[in-house]
């Protein structure tokens, strides 16, 4: 959902944009594969990609977010993904009054980071806050325990 938000906001995609899932993403060497490979989802838009969990769609958006003047730039892609994950509170602790690890945003591979698979690390409560922000139109709340 972070990548979908980034792609939509940055104008990389629109709600009607379709991307052809070719199974394996070949814009980079040793490109990752969609979970459905050797099959594919075919031509798919962002709503369908979220519904079907189409890795290829989000690899392409992550790749496009990484482009600077027509050239793939991994550092720029990481910055873009982290910019949008921060908007969902994935750059800070939740505020809960128990021991909590500081979240770790990605530092590499924006293509696989676009589906949440990289060197990032989040606790379950941090992911809960992220999903809550998605569910309530983007408001990120600090968590607290009630007695």
Q: Which residues are covered by each model-predicted region?
A:
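Beta-lactam-recognizing serine transpeptidase/beta-lactamase-like catalytic domain environment
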Residues: 2-147
